[in-house]
Every structure is written in C-alpha cells, then in structure tokens.
C-alpha cells in the first residue's frame, strides 16, 4: 500500500511539473526551452502509470485521489497559497476513495 501511494505521488508530481512548465512559458513568458523538460516529465508520468498492477481504469481512478492531494501541496509550497478548511477536507475524502479502490485491487 505504501509503495503504491508513493508511486502515485511521484506520478502526480511528474504530471504537475509537466503541465506547470508550459504554463510558465505561456502565462509568465518563461523560456520556450521549458517545453523540453515538460515533455520529459509527461512521458515519465505516463510510464509511471504503467507500473501499477491493476487495470488502467482502476489505476486512473485511484490516482485521482492522490493527484488532488499533490496539487494542493503544490498550491501551498509553490504558489504560496494558505490552504483553507475546504482544501484539507476535499483531499481527505478523495484519499478515502483512493484507499477503497486500492484495497479492492487484490479482492477482484
């Protein structure tokens, strides 16, 4: 379970970085060269998704819960936005859903 969760967090980080770098280029006039590491990060994101031992739809559904948490950590650390009660409650609910799906992997 811990290995799966850590893999999901690494996957989410790759996806967020892969999307954030082009965002910097488009919104903040950063260097176009950021598209190169963005592409690499997104390719790594896709590869990491293939490492999970479950059907792709289950992986994507469970991954969504961890993605929400990772995105909010990004919001706090990178964007510097203070998290609200709602920002904490939403991921808690999402992680409960992720946990139900992952626990069920071995039972189907």
From Swiss-Prot:
Subcellular localization(s) per the UniProt record: Cell inner membrane
Record keywords: Cell inner membrane, Cell membrane, Membrane, Transmembrane, Transmembrane helix
GO terms for cellular component: plasma membrane
The organism's place on the tree of life at top rank: Bacteria
Transmembrane spans: 6-26, 31-51, 61-81, 85-105
Membrane topology per record: Multi-pass membrane protein
Chief site of localization: membrane
Topological domain ranges for the Cytoplasmic compartment: 27-30, 82-84
InterPro entries: UPF0060
Record topology, Periplasmic segments: 1-5, 52-60, 106-108
Family: Belongs to the UPF0060 family.
PANTHER family: UPF0060 MEMBRANE PROTEIN YNFA (PTHR36116:SF1)
Entry protein name: UPF0060 membrane protein YnfA
Originating species: Escherichia coli O157:H7
């Amino acid at each position: 379970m811990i290995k799966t969760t850590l893999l999901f967090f690494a996957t989410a980080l790759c996806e967020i970085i892969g999307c954030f770098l082009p965002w910097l280029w488009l919104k903040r006039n950063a260097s176009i060269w950021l598209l190169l590491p963005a592409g690499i990060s997104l390719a790594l994101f896709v590869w990491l998704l293939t490492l999970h031992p479950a059907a792709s739809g289950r992986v994507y559904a469970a991954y969504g819960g961890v993605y929400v948490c990772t995105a909010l950590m990004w919001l706090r650390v990178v964007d510097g936005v203070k998290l609200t009660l709602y920002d904490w409650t939403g991921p808690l609910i999402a992680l409960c859903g992720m946990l139900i799906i992952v626990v069920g992997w071995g039972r189907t």
